[in-house]
Structures are given as structure tokens and as C-alpha cells.
A protein has these predicted regions:
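Surface-exposed alpha-helical segments enriched in charged/polar residues
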Residues: 3, 32, 36, 101-105, ...
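Substrate-binding surface in catalytic domains of secreted glycosidases
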Residues: 16-138, 144-149
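Substrate-binding cleft of secreted/luminal carbohydrate-active enzymes
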Residues: 114-199
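Short, acidic/polar
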Residues: 1-4, 57-70, 154-168
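Short acidic catalytic loops
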Residues: 2-19, 46, 77-80, 173-177
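Short loop/turn motifs at secondary-structure junctions
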Residues: 6-8, 73, 110, 170-171
Length: 199
């Protein structure tokens, strides 16, 4: 499929069912098989991974599912540094830095193989950034807004720029979840904020 459609490779985002216990070995076997097959064709294999640590510092069980063999087999990892907790803990700047520190420090991943993930949505519930802006036109200038009578926490323009600059200076790159949740207004766009942050 990669060759047929001209893809650069495959990103493995395995979230369910949990990959721990006996299935951890099966997951490792799958990743090693895919890595061999893709690398033989000059293709990439990347993996989305949990942040590694929760907003209150606890290690996520999922992080251990990515064995050293798996981490060595992939070309880079996409650290999902969001959904770290309720309220402002969902995806703060500090949470992103701590997530990167877990993978680079505790797990010894080379920084160039660690890609920082940022959300284009808010919690609790699920509110895309564009929808948040529709509810509060000033939402881009902060990380908290009221949407349908509910407190929603997300990353505004300043936080996204700061995270992008951190990724530029310390990591292998930045990724988003996900593009359709942004706004078409280039002056308030989070994708535009990333562009400014990585310059």
C-alpha cells in the first residue's frame, strides 16, 4: 500500500485493546516485523505513544508497552502530550515538557526521534478549537473558555507557539491531533501558530 499510494511509511497508533501483559510481546513482534518489512523498502515506521507521565507525575501503564526493542525499531515516536488530566492539566506546557523528558530521559530516546504532539481540541468532553472559537471569538488568546455552559481547557495560540519553539529547540519535531479541528481564520489558526513557533 505504501508503494501503491506513494506513502513515506506507516504510523502505528495502537490504543485499544491495551498493549500490556501477554499482548505486549505480540505487539513487539508486530512492530519488529513491520520495521523490517518497511525499512527494507526504504519506508518509515513511526509510533504514536502516550505521554508517559500523567499531569500529576504518575507513569502510564501504556508507556511500558513500548519496549526498548520497539523504540529502537521505529524511526521516531509521536508523543501524545494531551489528555493528561482534567481542566488545565489536559495539555499544559509543563505537561508537554515532562512528557518529552520521560521519553528522552527515563526511556533514553534520542531527542531527534521524539516528536511532540499537541491538541487542536479541548477537554473535558471534546470541543474542536474551531468550535471553541465560534463560542468565544477571543479564545485564541487564552487556554480556557466557556463552551455551551461548560469550562473547556485547550491550547491557545501562545501556548502552541511556545510548545512549537520547545520542539524546534529540543526535539525532532511537532505533530497535531488533528487538522480539521483548527480554524480557517489564519490570524487565529493553531497551525499558523506552529509555523511561527518553529521559525
Amino acid at each position: 500500500m505504501c508503494n501503491e499510494y506513494g506513502f513515506d511509511g506507516v504510523d502505528m497508533d495502537w490504543e485499544h485493546p491495551r498493549v500490556d501483559g501477554p499482548s505486549k510481546d505480540q505487539y513487539q513482534e508486530l512492530i519488529l516485523y513491520l520495521a523490517d518489512a518497511l525499512h527494507a523498502q526504504g519506508k518509515l515506521l513511526t509510533s504514536a505513544v502516550v505521554s508517559g507521565v500523567s499531569a500529576d507525575g504518575n507513569i502510564y501503564y501504556d508507556a511500558a508497552a513500548h519496549s526498548d526493542a520497539v523504540l529502537n525499531a521505529v524511526d521516531w515516536i509521536h508523543v501524545m502530550a494531551y489528555d493528561g488530566g482534567d481542566g488545565e492539566r489536559h495539555s499544559s506546557y509543563d505537561f508537554a515538557v515532562n512528557s518529552a523528558a520521560y521519553w528522552c530521559g527515563t526511556r533514553k530516546m534520542p531527542a531527534g526521534k521524539v516528536v511532540l504532539g499537541v491538541p487542536f481540541y479541548g477537554r473535558p468532553g471534546w470541543a474542536g478549537y474551531g468550535d471553541i472559537l465560534a463560542a468565544d471569538p477571543d479564545a485564541g488568546n487564552k487556554d480556557h473558555a466557556m463552551v455551551s455552559g461548560m469550562d473547556v481547557w485547550y491550547n491557545g495560540i501562545s501556548t502552541i507557539e511556545k510548545k512549537a519553539a520547545y520542539a524546534r529547540n529540543n526535539l525532532g519535531g511537532i505533530m497535531i491531533w488533528e487538522l480539521t479541528q483548527d480554524t480557517d481564520d489564519s490570524g487565529k489558526s493553531l497551525l499558523s501558530a506552529i509555523g511561527r513557533g518553529i521559525q
